[in-house]
Amino acid sequence: AAMMAGHPNDSTPESLRNTAFTLHMGANDSAYNRNKVAAQWEKLLAGLQEKDPQGYTHLVKIHEGKGHWMDREDRVAVPWMAKHTRNPLPQRIVWKQDDVTHNRFYWLAVNNDNRRGRTTTIVQRDGQTFNIERCDLQKIIIRLNDDLCNLNKPITVSYQGNNIFRGKVTRSSELIRQTILERGDYTSVFSAEITVTIPSK
C-alpha cells in the first residue's frame, strides 16, 4: 500500500525483523520531511541488518528528481516483494510496541491489563527452548502449536539465560478458537500457551 499522508515520524523499524520491507520515496517529496525520514530509515534498517544478518530484509529507494508520485517508478516494489514469503513462525522475534499497542505479535502475546506502549520484547527460539533476551513488561505469553514445537515434550523458557519455566503444556480447544477469531489466519492458530512472569531486576 502507498503510505502518502502525514505522520508524526516517531515510528522505528525494530519490529520489522521478520518482514520483507521496501520503502520508496521521491527525493523531492519534502512534505512532512518525508524524504529526510526515508533516508534516515534506510540507515536505520541497514544498521539493524548489520547487527542481525538473518533479519531486516529491506530495500529503500530514493527516486532522484521525483516528487510525491514518483512517476510510478515505485512499481519496482512489486516484483521485489514477490520474491519474499511471509514466515508466521520465526525463530526470533523483536517486538517494539508503539503508542498504539497490540495484544499479539507472531507467537507472543500480552493480556490487555499488561499491555504498554514504548516497550520492547526480544525472544529467541531454539527447538523446545525459548530465551527471553529482553522484556519490558511484567508478564509475557508465549503461544505454541505443533508446527512451532513438539508439544508432547517439555518446553523450556529462560530469561537472559536463567530458566524460569520447564514443563509440558496442555492443548486447549478454547485457545484454538480464540486465535482463529483474532486473525482468521490458519498459520497463526495456537493450541497452547505459557504465561511467564519476568523476574524483577
PLM region descriptions:
Residues A46-K201:
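Alpha/beta-hydrolase-fold serine-hydrolase catalytic core, especially in secreted/extracellular enzymes
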Residues A2-M81:
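The feature captures the conserved acid-bearing segment of alpha/beta-hydrolase catalytic domains
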